[in-house]
């Protein structure tokens, strides 16, 4: 059974790189250039066991990507066919290298998740997608077992096929004992509040699951020529789209037992919260989607600090929500963990607030029910 993915990705021909519209190659090249000035991480192999806990201070990284071999090969093959350059830090990635970089940054535990681009589809028929998702989750669970206490897992879901997604939810929680699931902010032109996803969220709500969202640019907007690549503007904006869609669809209000975690300080939510409330807070059906008010709904969500350890976004975020709802995230390996840790520590936050963000909140969020 092959899905007609055009219904999910609009006119874009590249389901893999839906984050960058139909201009995946140039966007990827621009992104590589943009990342050139960022301190990238070296991936090391063959690290002695006695070094695996070196210089660890208890931080928990909730935004940490990984690359199972089969997945990595499928990704690179797809890029090679289209002459798209690989990310150097992704090419160098190893399990042992991730541990070494965690030790360097003082990160005790990292929660593994897939990046939204390319996701798990690769223009494959559904049975192959289901196989890819299973292999990714099995590999993540293997890392959790092999490096006890150092990794957790936000399991991947395909989302576009409800029956196989529900089956995978059962497997990752009951067999693999995953910490939660990781999903995209959109699937083509469907955001997470779409009715098609309701059965999935109903099951996740029944399990009181932790649901982590990673953004990608909408298929409509990857070719907008603003002089930069989609990761700079469109990616954080799509987190905002996802949050607003979940809010206005009533999904947040309906599924109260899901714990929701969003990347990059909620995208532009902290800056637009007042505007969202202004236009929707007094709607006739506001009690349906925001029973305690729009800002109250936004305050009960969780947000990570990935690419947001700058005074302006963190000040806006902490004005909107209590510090108990913020967790540290790095976006490794695209951004160095130690760089993010240092930037967070230099924001002048109260010591108690800093400790909450670095580890206390994440440990509470990840605690088993």
Give residue ranges: language-model regions.
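Active-site gating/metal-coordination segments in enzymes
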Residues: 108-109, 114-246
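Short amphipathic alpha-helices and their capping/turn segments at secondary-structure boundaries
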Residues: 52-57, 94-106, 196-211, 250-253, ...
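Mid-to-C-terminal alpha-helical segments outside catalytic/metal-binding sites
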Residues: 2-47, 55-58, 62, 68-109, ...
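Conserved N-terminal glycine/acidic-rich loop preference
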Residues: 210-213, 237-247, 252, 268-287
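Short, well-ordered coil/turn segments that N-cap beta-strands
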Residues: 58, 106-109, 147-153, 176-180, ...
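Active-site gating loops and adjacent loop-to-helix segments of metal-dependent hydrolytic enzymes
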Residues: 8-17, 68-93, 123-130, 218-239, ...
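Histidine-centered divalent metal-coordination motifs
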Residues: 63-65, 214, 264
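Active-site-adjacent C-terminal substructures of enzyme catalytic domains
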Residues: 236-240, 251-257, 281-337
